[in-house]
Amino acid sequence: MVLLYTPKQKTKNVQTITADILDLDYQGLGVAKINGKTWFIENALPHEKVECRILEDKRQYGHAIVKKWRVKSPERLEPKCAHFMRCGGCQGQHIPIEMQRKAKESALFKRLSKLQSEPISFQPMICGDAWAYRRRVRLSLWFNPSTKQIEMGFRQKNTNDLIPVQSCEVAEPAINYLLPKLTALLEKFSAPKQLGHIELVAADNGVAMLLRYTKNLAEIDRTLLLKFAEQEKLMLFLQSDKGIEQIYGDAPYYQFSDGIKLHFDIRDFIQVNSALNEPMVNTALDWLELSQQDCVLDLFCGMGNFTLPLAKRVKSAVGIEGVFEMVQKAAQNAERNQIKNIEFFQADLDQSFVEQPWANQSFNKILLDPPRSGAAFALNALCELKAEKILYVSCNPATLVRDAEILCNFGYKIEKSAVIDMFPHTGHLESITLFTTK
């Protein structure tokens, strides 16, 4: 008889630390110092003493998550959502909103103040309701082989597992109204395994819904969807490998208080927080101190969210966008709103654009709203235009600091800045910053 030796698998030791929480960073993580190293700890608040499981241990910093509280902060809140700490959407429901906002303002102040000796005028935060603010949600769909039912919900944090949901505390009421109705609808589908995901967007003229499916949709299911769209007055879109088709309703749009309407397609980027979009746009235009003598360049303009409102205040406006379809939509939006002093061009702003016709025009003011990667390449060329004011809307403090340093090296100074609390209960830090010539 042959004896086979099977080595025992080594169990991985779970490393733990005990920490006194000193501060809160803008992402909602508790900050501790242990033997000179900074630790960022999930689900921890200042003045708490916690036992933590180490998630990441680097030379200069570490990342951990609370296992047990020895001392809890009296300011800690009970999360409103039953799925908090499992769903990947919110990170800060246990943190008072005033504490969240103070941490974000402190982070912006510390980062920008290091770039120049001149004082910066930090303005009051642009903020709104902390709940029911999201006008767009994406819902994953999964056929559960055990129950033979389709499940709808959000992805669990750091996994592909699905958490079924019937409501979301940060979604707009029009979206929450539909969630239980959608669950009931999906149970009637003849081929639920073919369904991929659902997107809901609360436009100003109703809710738009996109259903992604992977194989041909049965006619009975298509009829079911059409009846649902008619009943709930939805704008209904279907997406397959062949593309997106709208099968019911009008084109979605949102509207500014001055009457400007921006039409968009269901998958187009729009600001998720509808209540803060117009205050953000108005702040940008006010800080630029626009007049009928100004020629303004708007970079990363999308479908004209900033460009159309500013064009009504200036002599001329030019919008630059990398995606051709968005350039077309921006031009169509300008035409619909009868705004004639505006032009749109397609350009990859991460590539040289000095040969393009718009790059040789004269602009005395510039506005840019880049993606998270920032605008480093574009700024090196744009500074040669010597605009008197540059307004930068940022969704990433790291690239904002990098790009602000470029502008400061070209002779600009930071005049004023403010946080935009676009995503309460999350670690996202949006901001708006005005640069002027020294």
Curated annotation (Swiss-Prot):
List the catalytic activities from the record: uridine(1939) in 23S rRNA + S-adenosyl-L-methionine = 5-methyluridine(1939) in 23S rRNA + S-adenosyl-L-homocysteine + H(+)
According to the UniProt entry, its GO molecular function terms are: 4 iron, 4 sulfur cluster binding; iron ion binding; RNA binding; rRNA (uridine-C5-)-methyltransferase activity
Binding sites annotated in the UniProt record for S-adenosyl-L-methionine: Q271, F300, N305, E321, D348, D369
Q: Which residues form the active site?
A: C395
Q: Which Pfam families does the record match to this protein?
A: TRAM, tRNA_U5-meth_tr
Keyword Protein transport attached: no
Q: What is its EC number?
A: 2.1.1.190
* PROSITE patterns for the chain: SAM_MT_RNA_M5U (PS51687), TRAM (PS50926), TRMA_1 (PS01230), TRMA_2 (PS01231)
Gene Ontology BP term (one): rRNA base methylation
- What positions does the domain TRAM occupy? 10-68
Keywords attached to this Swiss-Prot or TrEMBL record, sorted alphabetically, are: 4Fe-4S, Iron, Iron-sulfur, Metal-binding, Methyltransferase, rRNA processing, S-adenosyl-L-methionine, Transferase
Q: Does the keyword Membrane apply?
A: no
Question: What does this gene product do?
Answer: Catalyzes the formation of 5-methyl-uridine at position 1939 (m5U1939) in 23S rRNA.
Q: What is this protein called?
A: 23S rRNA (uracil(1939)-C(5))-methyltransferase RlmD
Give the species. Answer: Haemophilus influenzae (strain ATCC 51907 / DSM 11121 / KW20 / Rd)
